[in-house]
């Protein structure tokens, strides 16, 4: 019922028909109350249904993050926005959930170890996705980034020296954990701040032991305290 509908009692009928048989007319009485809901963007319920953009690309056999991919995602994601969706699901690393879904969940941020041994990060797909969800779909409340504690406790990166993908082992409460995440969080914080997204960015932690969560939070508070 559109917000412009006047309160009152409306009467009509619904005609049900099929390929065989006679149409059936059903009387309908509808009472419209004087209250109306605000636009979904202003609803207070924090709706956070996770999105999997890669699944849309796979189903339609299009190049991920291409114009065709975004065109196919728009009506799907718009339904979420119309339901009051507040959060954008983002992947910091490759397979944060260790391949528990049918479709591969790739990173939106590429980790690359340069020939000089320094790690750098490519945010191109992350920026495309967040900008699309905010500006074209209308989901603007929160950027949920998964995760600092993946289920397989590994981070995939591209080693420029060999041209091959390799993995970093994550050990919360070990100095190596901070050595891995500290530089990333420093760079990532700087990046989202430059985009105007700092106050909306959150680090998602999913079904992880308390000791791991506390270790991750200690590192997070040290390098990017604005992140929720």
Per-range role (PLM):
Residues 10-18, 24-227:
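Aromatic-lined carbohydrate-binding surfaces of glycoside hydrolases
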Residues 2-7:
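Short, surface-exposed loop/turn segments at beta-strand-coil junctions that are enriched for proline
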